[in-house]
Amino acid sequence: MNKPLSLAGLGALFASCFIAANAHAQAGATLPTFQNASVHDPSVLKAGDTFYVFGSHLASAKSKDLMKWTQMTDGVSATNPLFLNGSKNVYTELAETFAWANTTTLWAPDVRQLADGKYYMYYDACQGDAPRSALGIAVANSPEGPYVNKGVILKSGMWGQASYDGTVYDALKHPNTVDPNVFFDNAGKLWMVYGSYSGGIFIMQMNPATGFPYPNQGYGKRLIGGNHSRIEGAYIMYSPATSYYYLFTSFGGLDANGGYNMRVARSTNPDGPYYDAQGNAMANVKSDPSKPLFDDASIAPYGVKMMGNFLFERKLGEAGTGIGTGYVSAGHNSAWYDPATGKHFLIFHTRFPERGEQHEVRVHQMFMNADGWPVVAPYRYANETAATVRPEFIFGDYLYVNHGKDITASIRKSQLITLNANGSITGAVSGTWRKVGTNQVEINLPGASTYKGVLLTQWDETSKSYVTTFTASSREGIAIFGSRLIPRTDMQVATAIYNELSLGATTAVTGNLTLPTTAARNAVISWTSSNPAVVSNTGVVTTPASGSVNVTLTARITKGTATLTKTFTVTVRKLGGLVAYYAFDGNLADSNGAFGAGSVSGGKIDVAGGSLTYGAGMRGNAAVFDGATGVRLPNGLISSNTYTVAMWLKPAQLTAFTTTFFGARTTDSWVSFLPMGHGGVGGASMLWSGSAWYDAGLGMNIPVNQWSHVAFTVNNGAVNVYVNGVKRFSGTNFPNVFTTTTGTFALGVNYWDTPYKGAIDELRIYNAALNDAEVAGIAH
């Protein structure tokens, strides 16, 4: 039996883990810094020493190093500088395009510099719910504009009329004229590849002197897709390293639930034919017209899948913070080859696990494997260079991801494997590995031919350290990633778990507790309750009929031969009571005494700063918010699916999406009360939940510069919202958000939107759903 370690010993062991972390990989000399930008469908341009990306909705950004991006523009508007030229703007310049496409926005463009030194933007607009689109050219002397329209070159969606090939437009076989990529081939010829869903991806030859298509090509030549198959975002890159042209596309739907994933095929000619690693002709890849629209199953087996939804999951006790590093619906990429360094880059947008539809640009380096197929570095580019990887930095535990071949919204979470010194692989999968040359690797696993790829040293943003990674793909077109974990002994792992293990807010528990049973490196946590009738060994809570009961929970952490124990005191309270009361009488204290005081934040929930003041309230003082300040409340204020939130509000102004009370389990699961809602409820005040969207519009706005009492009750999905004691909304199936005792809560701010300006007073939180009379009582 192992002797429990003292707290002093735990701290020393944890410190030694941290020190060792600096020597577990062939680390770079400096720590990388990143600055993020949001450009959907980023198309890359190198002009001088600056990289530009241009994307949908006229968004753009620039960077000197592919790591730190500066947002230049975002959103189609009359003031967007890319088209602003005196009295002219994007709406006047592209009036024909907007009129044809029945829209006021733009889709993914591409910008290329031609022989005259000018920059040619290939812009496009689409109706959205139909492939009625226009694609044209605008020209500027600088990548940053202003661009001057030269005219539309292609249209689609001319229902019942002759299309460019002389036949009546048919969306099953003719393209949607969007998503252009213009490129020079190895012989100096200019081409444009384009298309999205509908009839597929097409390519046509362009005149390098004018940038316009050569005549009599119709829509050009189809390369892949058709019958409304979900294939889009085509981009072609030539690699001198292999003498192949690589056709990148994105399969699936672009939103967080669409299963977007990047794939590649190759050809010795710019206009094909293109083949995948199994030798399948991509021209034959299309949906089955006899099946329902957007038939993903028919196209999923084809192409070399480079990346799908994944998460290098950080488990309890592993280095770093948060859930780990991963992507959701990464795609619509561009690519760039650097002739000076021989590096290949993949530039794409991505969403993220537990962050909904938020998206940012990411750049990853690509490497050509032994079979001439590009494999993508698992982590974002941090100025790494392929180099010899020494054996002592290869052996060890890895987080392993197999991207599969399917099109799915599911996130593939990492598994734990070990690359052993004898060439075996053990853990979640079994197989063999061997290093080839300086940094090539071959990995043999069940279910596929040999995975061929590279080993490299990369910056891991989760552990904030350099780690060894591998990336490889098989002849079946399946990609795998690996990320080496910091070497630790069993006791070091157990110690790290001990230090991080927490149950969150445990002073006013009324709902079931989430008791973790697994942790880093497959460690096991078992639980024992001092009073199973109140809190079971699995965290099931039975509330007392009156008062409160204290329960001791003991966690036993086991990793190999190492064992540690940690205890927690949990206070379980009766249902129906007030659990928190913030009166704001000159401070942010909980007058009920169950929770700690709030703290002042800046203009976002996770940003420091802010300046909170106090003024006259409904009772005593109130908290006064200046439009740049929030209040961070204690975690775990609500931890069940039965609760009431009540407060007095006096907004100084109404701005869309601005929150007053905000609570979240994650950035993708939250509840928010808005004095002014979105357009879906006509801008009315609303209780809002996402990203399992729920709109509880009140049909009115609480007034500016007047006090209004707002309350909402939730009872296992039944929801009611009240203003001044009067029920304004009643519904069912409200999302169950607060399933843990670690939820995040705030007033006046969230992660994204304009902060609240006005006053808040008398915030009360109950662990029960008050009835109509009870709500009316606290409102008067």
Indicate residue ranges for each PLM-predicted region.
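Carbohydrate-active catalytic/glycan-binding domains of CAZyme proteins
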Residues: 26-492
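Flexible glycan-contacting loops in extracellular carbohydrate-active proteins
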Residues: 731-759
